[in-house]
Amino acid sequence: AEDWSKINVVEGFSPDHITHTRFSGEIELGIFEKEMELPGGLKKKTGLHHVTLHNCSIGNNSLIENIPNYIANYRIGSDCFIQNVNLILTEGESCFGNNTEVSVLNETGGREVPIYNRLSAQLAYIIAMYRHRPDLIARLREMIEAYSLAQKSCYGKIGNGVHIVNTGTIRNVCIGDYCQIDGTSRLENGSINSNREAPVYIGPNVTAEDFIVSSGAHISDGVVMSRCFIGQACHLTHLFSAHDSLFFSNCQSENGEACAIFAGPYTVTMHKSSLLIAGMFSFLNAGSGSNQSNHMYKLGPIHQGVVERGSKTTSDSYILWPAKVGAFSLIMGRHVNHPDTSGMPFSYLIEHGNRSYLVPGANLKSVGTIRDAQKWPKRDKRTDPDKLDCINFNLLSPYTIQKMLQGIDTLQGLKQTSGETSECYSFQSTTIKNSSLNKGIDLYTLAVHKFMGNSIIKRLEGAPFSDLNDLHDRLKLTDSLGEGEWIDLSGLIVPKQAVKDEIDRIVGNPDSTLEETESFFQAMHRRYYDMEWTWVCSIMPRWYGKTVDRLSPRDIIRIVRQWNEAVVSLDRMLYDDARKEFSMISRIGFGVDGSTRQRDFDFEQVRGEFENDAFVKMVCKHIEDKTALGNELIGRLETLMTSMPQH
């Protein structure tokens, strides 16, 4: 040691397990008395071997060995294992990635989001997209800067139970508890918010700078990222590269590339040839070769696009930004005319003969759409009890139903304007065929009946009522919020007015905090179904011709029957769509060296029989269950009607 007086040790300390170690500056040491068991069963005594420490504190029972360079300015916790790491240091004061500006959506700037440890998809959405409120953006920037300054330190932190092995350089990185870093190349200026409930894994050949990684994330196999926020339980592997991008909960990115994207929850891109650039996505499934252009070779990469929640891109799909694609759409082919299909959710956007064709509502009868809705909640890998993002998985919500209602009006308006016998109709740089238009109206109508009926049945399910007053009590509003337009805040479906009120509160209150805004999003998420009911009641006059307090038992029976017809009709469409996967065409390639009979047998061994398919069984059971649910409520309402005085 340069100065032994600067070395402080805890009571019970013994130097028996410290060898070939140099100390410099202020040093604090814990005890080294336990053994550490490594993978494969090897046991090692904790201690310090072949390491140089400068201005460091070490907790109890950590093992640090074989550090070719040195460790400087770090607070290292207990039960850590650090081996074969070239260099770990904090240089100067650092905020460890907090307040890093990420030029999301527009590579040239203008929508920068300052990242911080607790950034949620909802707050990032507002910062990126609400530039029409500069007073709000300035206030949020102040709040994030204040938070970041509170994280500022000359000392980095390595939490308890951390393993770092065979790694290159770690510079100005704050590492949370139970993180595992194995074979990583370089980490600079970042925070890894690992914890016991949701440890983070950073694997071989990862290079990252100016970043924040949230709990439960897995990053490995040559990922290269710069100026990125990685949300909870995200999975980035297999040479994926990203810059100036935000990834929120449960995103999965492999092989491809992301530039300036806003990847809301469940954005998935798995293929080498896929490029996501300058777009906002959520619940996306990107096919191989999917890409977009944000550059027209004029004023630079200044264009952006929005693909609303739940959409899919097929192999080799392409969109020339700017464009906006409606929720739960399927994008196939190349689209260069800047379509805006946000008013037509659940549609197919297909290229044919260099034209973009829109098939409204077609995705409502797709098996894939329903399977996605079922698997998203099951694929929520977040184990951290403190969940940063609010995620609503509903396919049908005020957000999508309001668009369907507008879609019905738009499609009917096109018929009136261009004539019912027109072969094709023009809509927002796309073409809609006559047959597609009429089917779209029918499909949207079925979906609205299904959603409205669902909401009413949920209110009355399991709720006893003995007279008309009882019935209307069950249907009363339980939340004052909910009327008007709804929006999707990258996973959180919420009334637009509620967001406006919160923005006004933030701007009008100089003492507002990030914690209060977090609490607002959480409260909106909890109140969703109550606010949804308020919205449903607000559109009953349009859809049913009556306000909720004027509904009679007979009216509700009619609504339930419409709901049941809609549910069964849509389910039968799903059933027929699933059957296509068992057609003769689907059997091509089976039984390669055999007869037709052997081909069919080979197919059944691999794929099973149609009637025994898990999804097909689920659809059939869904029809039975919903029919029984509707009949039960109709029975109770008919009983109520018989007990009511006749006029």
Residues of each region from the PLM?
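Long, compositionally biased intrinsically disordered regions
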Residues: 352-647
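Glycine-rich hexapeptide-repeat left-handed beta-helix
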Residues: 9-32, 36-48, 65-147, 182-183, ...
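Long, charge-dense tracts
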Residues: 69-70, 74-76, 80-81, 86-96, ...
